[in-house]
UniProtKB/Swiss-Prot annotation:
Belongs to the class-I aminoacyl-tRNA synthetase family. MetG type 1 subfamily. This is Methionine--tRNA ligase. Pfam families: tRNA-synt_1g (PF09334). Keywords: Aminoacyl-tRNA synthetase, ATP-binding, Cytoplasm, Ligase, Metal-binding, Nucleotide-binding, Protein biosynthesis, Zinc. PROSITE patterns: AA_TRNA_LIGASE_I (PS00178). The gene is metG. It is found in: Cytoplasm. The keyword Cytoplasm applies. It comes from the Bacteria. A motif ('KMSKS' region) lies at residues 330-334. It catalyses: tRNA(Met) + L-methionine + ATP = L-methionyl-tRNA(Met) + AMP + diphosphate. Is required not only for elongation of protein synthesis but also for the initiation of all mRNA translation through initiator tRNA(fMet) aminoacylation.
């Protein structure tokens, strides 16, 4: 019987171009956690979708001279394939440009309006007169009014985290034309976020946020919550607001609702899953959002307020991570400091990046640097030299001289107990998303396993003739395989390709439930080398793309 029901989401990739390896950090982090939960017999549903609306998509499709619906459908398939090839175990990968999202969005908006949470008023906006378009926040570039950092977007500063309006920006420019925009008035619709100040303040202190996130969110409360503009003027690609002639829902109105729309789509595919069980206000299901630090405001304030106002449940936890830097510098397409997922996959195994990110990830919100020299050294040292070498050096004798059968007893039961006792600490670290520390503990065990084999030196015992000596050597080699099995069980949430291969090699399913039971008198298969050391040529090919 499953212990718990859990719904996990990743933030929705934007459907205006290919994914780069920085994007994969979140998908990998969430997938490791999800795979661990499934190994512990929890019933987990893991979903994501493409964020498929907004001015950026409209402009991109114009630039490519393609219908935006055709463009987002193509990109959605590319994103999904990238996730599949990184073995991200989604139960459903959908799109916000869907029937389910449209229905939920309109239903929620109607409830908000009926409850008096939608206000309307005229506001001053920046307008690109050359292109006849009101400029979205992300299409206005200027200097942050708080820290004076240059080249910041019109809604928030990625240097100091300040939240502001485009009119607050110093020396704003249109990112479309490069010209200084003019100020123009327009009527907009607002969600009355301040109405939820008290309930949100209580909720953020209920343990749903990391300590670092909580401190940041409390700063926004000190400044005072503001009404949230949920409308955009045409031209725009998205869903029209009911009973308006030229207004569309702001992308950040329909994007979080995309979590619900994607799950509703999954319910259509699987009639045994009931939408209300997961989203009703009294739901006992645990709901977790994995997100990047730059979208904390939307998920910690705007989104739970929308859910509360419509009598839906709020998230159990919001797990925020930092950004990925590449060789010490911010990932930037304009500066050619980025690597697309497809480029990486054309040269290297996805397990390698999954492992490297795991060695860097924790429950903190620190940025993670992908240094390719460190990446190569760590993967070669840990996965190749420590883990796979343990299987390789111990399996040959067993398959050649004992028909693949492991010995019928453990050579060192105390050592085996030491390895399986680590499951409690390692499991706790996985549960708390302290993957870096979990990898460190696992590699300490790998070192201990290899030291045991080095000290016993069964290859020397084999050279001493006699059945007795061969049996002693068999027990030692078998012990090495027993320890390898425990290690790959611990690594299974991180390395799906390696664990799948190891299950074929060991001729058994790798399960946390039977880790205590060794494979005595058990037949294994021949060990084949499917993982290879990373070399500098491969790294150069990726970097130079």
């Amino acid at each position: 019987m499953p212990n718990k029901k859990i719904l996990v989401t990743c933030a929705l990739p934007y459907a205006n171009g290919p994914l780069h390896i920085g994007h994969m950090l979140e998908h990998i982090q969430a997938d490791i956690w999800v795979r661990y939960q499934r190994m512990k017999n929890n019933e987990v549903y893991f979903i994501c979708a493409d964020d498929a609306h907004g001015t950026a998509i409209m402009l991109k499709s114009k630039q490519l001279n393609i219908n935006p619906e055709i463009m987002i459908a193509k990109i959605q398939q590319e994103h999904y394939q990238d996730c599949c090839d990184f073995n991200i175990s989604y139960n459903n990968y959908h799109s916000t440009h869907s029937e389910e999202n449209y229905e939920l969005l309109n239903s929620i908006y109607t409830k908000l309006k009926k409850s008096g949470f939608i206000k309307s008023r005229f506001i001053s906006q920046l307008y690109d007169a050359q292109n006849n378009i009101f400029l979205p926040d992300r299409f206005i570039i200027g200097t942050c009014p708080k820290c004076r950092a240059h080249n910041q977007n019109g809604d928030n500063c990625d240097q100091c985290g300040a939240i502001y309006t485009p009119l607050d920006l110093i020396n704003p420019k249109s990112a479309i034309s490069g010209k200084s925009p003019i100020i123009k008035k327009s009527k907009h619709l607002f969600f009355d976020l301040p109405q939820f100040t008290k309930s949100l303040y209580t909720w953020i202190h209920s343990g749903v946020l990391q300590e670092e996130t909580l401190h940041k969110v409390k700063e926004w409360f000190k400044l005072g919550l503001k009404e949230w503009d949920i409308s955009r003027n045409e031209p725009y690609f998205g869903f029209k607001i009911p009973n308006t002639s030229s207004k569309y829902f702001y992308v950040w109105m329909d994007a979080p609702i995309g979590y619900m729309g994607t799950f509703k789509n999954l319910c259509k595919k699987n009639k045994n899953i009931l939408f209300e069980d997961f989203w009703s206000i009294n739901s006992k299901v645990e709901l977790y959002h994995f997100i990047g630090k730059d979208i904390t405001y939307f998920h910690s304030l705007f989104w739970p307020a929308i859910l509360e106002s419509c009598q839906y449940r709020k998230p159990t936890g919001i797990f925020v991570h930092g950004h990925v830097t590449l060789n010490g510098s911010k990932i930037s397409k304009s500066k050619n400091n980025f690597i697309n997922v497809r480029t990486y996959l054309s040269h290297l195994n996805s397990d390698y990046l999954r492992y490297y990110y795991a060695t860097k990830l924790s429950s903190k919100i620190n940025d993670i640097d992908l240094n390719f020299n460190d990446f190569m050294l760590k993967v070669n040292a840990d996965i190749i030299n420590k883990i796979l070498n343990l299987a390789s050096r111990n399996s040959n004798f067993i398959t050649q001289y004992n028909y693949g059968y492991l010995s019928n007893s453990l050579e060192n039961s105390n050592l085996y107990d030491f390895f399986i006792d680590a499951q409690y600490l390692i499991g706790k670290l996985f549960q708390q998303r302290e993957f870096s520390e979990a990898m460190r503990k696992i590699m300490q065990l790998a070192d201990k396993a290899n030291q045991y084999i080095d000290k016993q030196a069964p290859w020397h015992i084999v050279k001493q003739h006699g059945i007795h000596n061969k049996n002693i050597a068999l027990c030692i080699f078998s012990m090495g395989i027993q320890l390898f099995r425990v290690l790959v069980i611990y690594l299974k949430p991180v390395l799906p390709i390696l664990s799948q291969y190891s299950e074929k090699f060991l001729n058994t399913r790798l399960s946390w439930n039977n880790i205590n039971i060794p494979l005595t008198n058990h037949k294994i298969n021949k060990f084949d080398i499917i993982f290879h050391r990373i070399n500098t040529n491969q790294i150069s090919s990726i970097i130079n793309k």
